[in-house]
Amino acid sequence: MSKTIPLRPANEQFTDSQWQAVFDGDENILVSASAGSGKTTVLVRRVIEKVKSGVDIDRLLIVTYTEAAAREMKERIQVALQKAMNEEQDPERRRHFSRQIALLPTANISTLHAFCLTVIRRFYYLIDIDPVFRMLTDETETLLLKEDVWDALREQFYAENQEAFYQLTANFSNDRSDDGLTNLIFSFYEFAKANPDPEAWINGLTQAYEVGDQLGESKLFQTYLKPLAVETLQRTLQRYEEMVTLTEGEEKLQKIWYLAQNEKEQTKQFLQFLERNDLESAYNLTELLSFDRYPTVRAEELKPTAEQAKQLREQNKKALNDLKKQLFTLSPDAMKQVLKEATPIVQEMAHVGKQFMEAYGAEKRLKNLVDFNDLEHYTLAILAKNQADGWHASEASVYYREKFDEVLVDEYQDINQLQESILYWLRRPLSTEGNLFMVGDVKQSIYSFRLADPTLFIEKYNQYGQGKEGKRIILAENFRSRKDVLDFTNLVFSQLMDERVGQIAYDESAALVHGFDQFSEAADYSTELLIYEKKATESVEFPELQSPELLIEDKTEGELYVTALKIRELIDQNFLIYDKKLKTDRPITYQDIVLLTPTKKNNLTILDVFKSLEIPVQVNDAQNYFQATEIRTMIALLQLIDNPYQDIPLAAVLRSPIVGLKENELVLIRLANKETSYYEAFLTFNQKMEPTMEEAVVQEKTIRFAESLEKWREQARRNQISNLLWTIYRETAYLDYVGGLPVGKQRQANLYALVDRAAAYEKTTFRGLFQFVRFIEKMQEKDKDLAEPVVLSEENAVRVMTIHASKGLEFPVVFVLDMTKEFNVSDLNERYIFEENLGVGIRYLQPEERVMYDTLPFLAIKQVRLRKLLSEEMRKLYVALTRAEQKLFLVGSYKDQAAMWKEWLKVGDVETLVLPAENRLQSKSSLMNWVGMTLVRHQKADEYQQEVVVSNVPQVKKHPANFHIQWFNEEQLRAAIQQLQLPERQAEDLAEKAQLSADKINRGLARLSFNYPFEVATRTTSYQSVSEIKRVFDDPDNKEIGKIEVREDNTIQAQPLIVNRMIEGDLSKPKFLDTVQAPSAAEIGTATHYLLQLIDLSKQPSYEEVRAVQERLVENKLILPAIAEKMNLEQIVAFFDTALGKQLIQHHQTVRREQPFSMLIEAEELIQNYPETTQDDLLIHGIIDGYIELDNQCILYDYKTDHVKGTSPQAISEIVERYRGQMNLYRRALQEATHKEVSHVYLILLNGGVIIDMQTGNVVDFIK
């Protein structure tokens, strides 16, 4: 029962709920504190009131999520205690407060890890651990240690030659490496160790694979897969009902009505099978699933209705096809067989993973190392003891339960299961008065990568809300933001977040309530959506190569220019914000603005764009530390000191200011000895006895450097690396040198940080320069860049940080960038997925068929993880929006406005407050799509789009939120930038970025026009590519070469020789001079080859899988979106249904794709009319699209995406003649490389839809 709460004084600033959170007690309490609700203030006040009531500060355990939060908490408590003591008149109470201030430095206010360390230091004897250990805190050191242990253990397993281990390796690795198995074991370890009882978790891994005879009755299907399928089918039936209603009674729409009725009955039958758990019938139905052609409607007045019905039907087709792929790729019997065969692999995974866990633990104990995970497990082992009748509190647990009057936990939503177990043994049992006080906001739980478990918060939220085991207090008032920001956030999340996606209902108790009423209304503070239209981007024109224009390379730059221009507008127009410290309005400054990004990958682009528009920007976590010139130079020098026989580091150091050689001087060193390594050439050059005058100047520098290098190498063997670095800095004056460069203080800070990094490394278990270099290389390899050291923190600059980094902070104006970035669900496409409660789901590689199958646990865990992943994305959006105090901007990009509205209007007709789960659970969606779907139902959206169907749900239609949408294209950005008054330097930067000067081009053309006097030798180059040779067959007249015929014997019959360099004679027109940037056939062909190179041949590729590969290529900027749109994916998929395509899949292990080759051929052998007196060789270079290597033969194939005039015998004959020479060269090169006969040569015409046997010249198959 709760204790009596004192009445809140009239002048008290706290709200009723805050007051309750401060004083309520005698039972466990969960405070659900929304963003900006003052939870830290409440927590501090609660501590102070406890102290005022006579509780000593050291009888409280206060757990924070970060060390910074712990420091802030101590500081705020000290200030409050000092204030209380100063205001107190009673001498006894003043002494009490004074004593609390004295106790504060040693009070238990810390992270849970720090408290665990205290427990272990005190009770280490209970678990027989050496109390003298070192904390293993460096991620890279941890990774290297894991790799060393795993390498040794893996070799041991290989030596044992057990079939089970080889099968495990084969299932998760490929023919190039077993990195897949390494990653699996490391992930296994992380998930196992996050569990309170790792051994129990490991022992239960195979349970999910033991489903019995009735697959439909299994817990996995019933709990995780059936609800998804039923929900999808119910929503599909609703859409068919809408189709029927739309078309009913209209004779000209009767065919559509019948189609909707038939497909609705088919869907209803599907649903009935699932509800009866009849998976066999459901599977058989999906095998017969087909969709008739949609009827054509010619009546103009009915076309809008027909189109509306068609859109509903398209959504249904996608939903049913997706459901089939998700759940019914295998029959129930086949799935049971797969589970049976996959079980031994999971058993071996558990065995190997457990062995690694033990070996890694033994290695850490041997070296007296303890990591954060060990701290938690050791603490749990100290607090709880396992006896015959279960777990009981140990003497340590009893001690702490008696010691602490209250356990206060901040950021409780980020606790994991292991940490929850520790808290359980620290708090008092439920049979007594509760003493656990938890504060957090599950809507801000965004640390799943640290295995945080928000369900722990949610369970208590629901239980305590019903008065079970504790009390729930909700802090809804937001004292941070304007009502404009809060209304917009509430509008969005009332429609997005519920138990299904987000994991908690965004109801009235969760909604944000405006609590700060001091803001003025000096400007429009409505949320703005800034949309960059990619389609509007055209090639940049350069009239007479004199007028520099803005060149936007991709959507990222487009969005950043939109953002930068909006910031310039705010600054230039003196946009007013309310200053809470000054308590008045003032003009905005750069320092008031923050850019929130999903990741750090675009930070360097942000720096470039903002610099070009003269906007100061601070990106302290740019993750470009290793890319800084001064750091790259020093790392190259350290690599050289470790091993001088490294050409690239040697050249880098010689070219750097440390030695100061020029390019031509580097050439002199190479000429001293052309046959050996560059270092040996360097030594030879230094020993040259009679150098030329030029060589003598260089030699003076190189000899001096060689002496320094030898001295540093000697020092590295006997001194610490940090001392070595100081020696180098001092002797080269490099530290002073970089200080004189632009941003000199930052560069010096970077070099200081390298010394700190070296000093930290020397405290690890690794030693020596070689290991340090490996250490640094591993950091670079794993993208664990050293954070760029912060030089200035209070400068007037726009700040950039990730959404994760912004948590707990607030800013007057917030721009959320890259909002249309597609959700990253790549982890769900791996061969394994781990989950805290369900264990592991694997994809099973059938060894004979070499086909990968999704197991039932994989399908179930994939759905669970997808919901969790998208729920966290939704919570990240909540964190991002609630960082804004006064003005919020959301930035994204779409192809054009039509594409944007198409995405947003998918839910325009939904009549429920919360949007359907299927729309929110689209993995290929984005944050902006989510936001857009909530806005189109608001009456404000009608101002921007006439097709908007304003929702009849009153909470949406007339919501008080306000927003504006603005669109920008490249032309508008260009015009806006030209109007800016940029300093000369910035203008020059833009010009340099956008334009090549005319005189530079003309100088290049003049060089290309130079006539070399030895004409005969120039007529044939010594290097030819097969593609260049091939081009001359297309149109010889345009290539300035006579008619050429390549014979079967690989010789070329040419007309009188004009030019024997078989390439185009004209310089290609620069891309920036093009007025239209339509993709060329060559660009489409190159992109198609990229795609074909990456398609997984271990199984029959589907359209969706091929599309996914294409999307990855676009995302990684290997192909442009405009080119992707022109690629014929249907033909690519259809090719794999041909006999040749199936042959590639059947022999996928011996298929070689994109194989480069070089072949030396005598010129007179290739070109008959070549002068006999000239003995020259041609180096033929090419890339073979692919071949199948069989036991005694090879099958060569080549893709072509050329436009084909038809498939008539004459057209086919022309194609065969056009490519015969190229294919003959490929065939010869392949035979020489493999020493095997090439039995077949196939030309695959993807656009023509045929496959040609080049030896017979006949069409052998059709691509349909």
Curated annotation (Swiss-Prot):
Q: Where does ATP bind?
A: 33-40
Could you tell me the keywords of this UniProt record?
ATP-binding, DNA damage, DNA repair, DNA-binding, Exonuclease, Helicase, Hydrolase, Isomerase, Nuclease, Nucleotide-binding
Pfam families with a match to the protein in the record: PDDEXK_1, UvrD-helicase, UvrD_C
Q: Give EC number(s), comma-separated.
A: 3.1.-.-, 5.6.2.4
- Which InterPro entries does the entry mention? AddA, DNA_helicase_UvrD-like_C, DNA_helicase_UvrD/REP, P-loop_NTPase, PDDEXK-like_dom_sf, PDDEXK_AddAB-type, Restrct_endonuc-II-like, UvrD-like_ATP-bd
Tell me if DNA repair is a UniProt keyword of this record: yes
Q: Where is the UvrD-like helicase ATP-binding domain?
A: 12-482
* Catalytic activity of the protein: Couples ATP hydrolysis with the unwinding of duplex DNA by translocating in the 3'-5' direction; ATP + H2O = ADP + phosphate + H(+)
Give the GO biological process terms: double-strand break repair via homologous recombination
What would you give as a GO molecular function for this chain, any one? 3'-5' exonuclease activity
- Choose one Gene Ontology CC annotation of this protein and give it: cytosol
Q: Which cofactor does it need?
A: Mg(2+)
Q: Using the record's annotation, list all stretches that form the UvrD-like helicase C-terminal domain.
A: 520-808
Share what the entry says about its subunit structure, partners included: Heterodimer of AddA and AddB/RexB.
Q: Which NCBIfam families match?
A: addA_Gpos (TIGR02785)
**Similarity comment:** Belongs to the helicase family. AddA subfamily.
Its annotated function is as follows:
The heterodimer acts as both an ATP-dependent DNA helicase and an ATP-dependent, dual-direction single-stranded exonuclease. Recognizes the chi site generating a DNA molecule suitable for the initiation of homologous recombination. The AddA nuclease domain is required for chi fragment generation; this subunit has the helicase and 3' -> 5' nuclease activities.
The protein here is known as: ATP-dependent helicase/nuclease subunit A
Could you read off the lineage of the organism from its UniProt record?
A: Bacteria, Bacillati, Bacillota, Bacilli, Lactobacillales
